[in-house]
A protein has these predicted regions:
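Acyltransferase
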Residues: 174-229
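DPxDG-like acidic metal-binding loop motif
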Residues: 60-91
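Residues at secondary-structure transition points
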Residues: 31-42, 70-74, 78, 176-180, ...
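N-terminal beta-alpha supersecondary unit
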Residues: 1-65
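Surface "functional belts" at beta-alpha junctions
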Residues: 23, 35, 90-180, 209, ...
Length: 229
């Protein structure tokens, strides 16, 4: 039996879960505007203590690897890597978008996260399988893709800010807001192969703003940017 600590801080909500294989033992989710760096470790301690568990009881850590908030992803990934290294246990990363997809929703399911300026991080799933690559896209492009689908379409995830635009473009589309769910991260991460702790990095899908601004003012390649840093 594998005990998994799963975490998702890719968005405004912070979600933690502990599972034994796919059975949920306990979960906490905080949907408050608070820096995840302040709340993550105390929340892990609270959950572990509530289940009378010790860190050494864990076999694997599953973390929402991205996309999402740059700061949130860095906090979760750094914490997951530190715990996995210290405890000498396995580490796996799970798509933050896939973890937003509810079970048993028919047709094309499109999880979205607000990426600002009317852009979104979007995935395209059918029966839990990706039918297009996850990407950072203008909402208009996502709506164009969804509008061309010959099957029911459901938008999930961070939908509130975009509900009016979705309904205007695709009146028949279903909209189902979903919060980050660490239990889903844990279940998705159960069967994945363990990843290298040293090489594990967030999946941003988009350059950070500082890098984009630098590249606008320089003709060199993105490799040059990294070298200069």
């Amino acid at each position: 039996m594998m005990k998994i600590l799963a975490m998702d801080t890719s968005n405004k909500a912070l979600s933690l879960a502990i599972l034994e294989n796919k059975e949920l033992l306990g979960q906490v989710t905080f949907n408050i505007k608070k820096n995840h760096s302040i709340t993550l470790m105390p929340a892990i301690d609270f959950l572990m203590n509530s289940l009378d568990m010790k860190p050494t009881d864990l076999d694997r850590i599953a973390v929402a690897q991205g996309p999402g908030s740059y700061t949130g992803l860095r906090i979760a990934v750094a914490t997951a890597k530190t715990l996995a290294h210290t405890l000498k246990i396995e580490l796996v990363g799970v798509s933050s978008l896939l973890a937003l997809v509810p079970e048993q929703v028919e047709g094309l399911v499109i999880p979205i996260m607000d990426a600002r300026r009317n852009n979104v991080y979007a995935g395209f799933y059918q029966s839990g399988q990706a039918v297009r690559s996850e990407a950072h896209l203008p909402l208009a492009e996502v709506l164009e893709i969804a509008g061309a689908a010959d099957q029911p379409v459901t938008f999930v995830g961070e939908t509130a800010a975009f509900a009016e635009q979705i309904k205007a473009a695709i009146p028949q589309a279903a909209i189902q807001p979903t919060l980050p769910d660490a239990a889903a991260v844990g279940r998705l991460g159960l069967d994945l192969p363990a990843q290298s702790i040293h090489d594990f990095v967030p999946s941003y899908l988009k350059r950070v703003e500082a890098e984009e601004n630098w590249l606008k003012n320089h003709k060199e390649s993105s490799d040059s940017y990294i070298q200069r840093l």
